[in-house]
């Protein structure tokens, strides 16, 4: 007798399905309507994937300089939708808990793609900067990327303009990390004095 494997599927309510579809379509108006009508900003799709991961998916698709320019409107829509979801209480860690050390957080993911404005959003909404994935924090991922850039510069097959653009974005991401860390310690010292 053949055994049939049943894939675990998570139930998705009608209003959450509308929200998920609107995010997939990058339709800000429909996202707003679904949220206003009670959709869960922390809903999961049928596979159990948190909606934040769907919202940042566009940034992994269009990575090189040409693609980023070509798909500027899509990227801007995705950023606006992500901001809206977060403002409605969506988890900036995309359902990843501190005890889950096998998965990266959305902040780590956008750092990998050097999406500074998206990283700022996650930091603004309280993303876990201390999360460790395979022994690395989001800052460790930036340092790894910086080291990788050195190897790529030594490779004569790489497009110099593309590498320069990536290095500029990496430098801006480090500046964001330093500013965030400085703000954290400033607030920590302020709280200790009180």
Per-segment meaning from a language model:
Residues 53-56, 74-75, 79-100:
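Alpha-helical adaptor scaffolds
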Residues 24, 67, 71-78, 163, ...:
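Flexible, glycine- and charge-enriched loops at secondary-structure boundaries
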Residues 2-14, 125, 143-194:
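Ankyrin-repeat-protein effector appendages
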Residues 32-40, 82-92, 120-128, 174-183:
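Ankyrin repeat domain, specifically the short helix-to-loop turn at the C-terminus of the second helix
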Residues 9-21, 44-69, 95-109, 132-148, ...:
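Ankyrin-repeat boundary/"N-cap" motif
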Residues 30, 77-81, 117-118, 166-173:
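Conserved ankyrin/ankyrin-like repeat signature
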């Amino acid at each position: 007798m053949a055994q049939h494997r049943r894939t675990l599927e998570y139930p998705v309510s009608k209003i959450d399905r509308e929200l998920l579809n609107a995010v997939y379509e990058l339709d800000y108006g429909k996202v707003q309507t679904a949220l206003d009508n009670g959709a869960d900003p922390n809903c999961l799709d049928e596979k159990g994937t948190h909606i934040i991961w769907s919202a940042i998916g566009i940034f992994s698709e269009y990575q090189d300089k040409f693609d980023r320019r070509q798909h500027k409107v899509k990227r801007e829509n995705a950023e606006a939708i992500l901001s809206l979801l977060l403002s409605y209480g969506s988890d900036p860690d995309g359902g990843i808990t501190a005890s889950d050390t096998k998965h990266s957080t959305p902040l780590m993911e956008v750092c990998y793609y050097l999406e500074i404005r998206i990283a700022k959003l996650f930091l603004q909404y309280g993303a876990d900067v201390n999360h460790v994935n395979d022994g690395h924090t989001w800052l460790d991922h930036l340092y790894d990327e910086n080291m990788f850039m050195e190897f790529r510069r030594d490779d004569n097959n790489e497009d110099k303009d593309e590498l320069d653009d990536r290095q500029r974005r990496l430098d801006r991401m480090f500046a964001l990390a330093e500013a965030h860390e400085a703000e954290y310690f400033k607030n920590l010292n302020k709280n200790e004095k009180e």
